Amino acid sequence: FLGYEFNSTETEVKLIFQNGENVDCVASGDCVIILDKTPFYGESGGQVGDSGKLISKNNEVRVSDTQKVGNFYLHVCHIEKGEVRVNQKLNAEIDINRRNAITSNHSATHLMHSALRNNLGMHVQQKGSLVSEEKLRFDFSHKQKVTTEEILKIEREVNYEINSAKDTQVIETTYEESQKLGALAFFGEKYGEKVRVLKICDDYSVELCGGTHVKNSSEIKSFKIMSETSI
């Protein structure tokens, strides 16, 4: 996966699946393509998968979604032009405007998590999330309904951090070292030998995360809570 650093790359088709069958080539319709390297983020950690296109001089393939299964990135595709074959070279390009919107919402999720803990108590833990280009949803543990006053405080705090225009820091380290940095790790996830620590607005938000994030908090622009419900 090259998507942390690159929005496009030259790549090679390794596997093609159509109608549940492993095939050598595909000339029309829907299919799933696995590439040798990709800038497309595969859905995980609450963040939806990237979309975009795979192109060459004679080919155009629309990628509507990307799923991650183990270490494989499954590109959900529709053939727009030409025939695609295994071992063929293509240029993989994500929809950068959509990715940027998703990325902003993911970073806003981290800031909101910190604001929730600061205003409601350190017992608050993330239980799930949905991060898309249109919105974010954040599931968390709390013993009672969040009041209107608390919601306004959380919004103000998050927007203050956004407007501070601070750079995001990414640290790749061991899980043990990440805990010394104070990184939050929830969901009961199993972590490998190396983990990725995201520091947004200095030490305001420090979490383990494999998602994509803004380089500076000002890219989020603004934050507004539209609704709060219990589940």
Predicted features and spans:
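A glycine- and charged-residue-rich anion-binding loop/surface
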Residues: 1-231
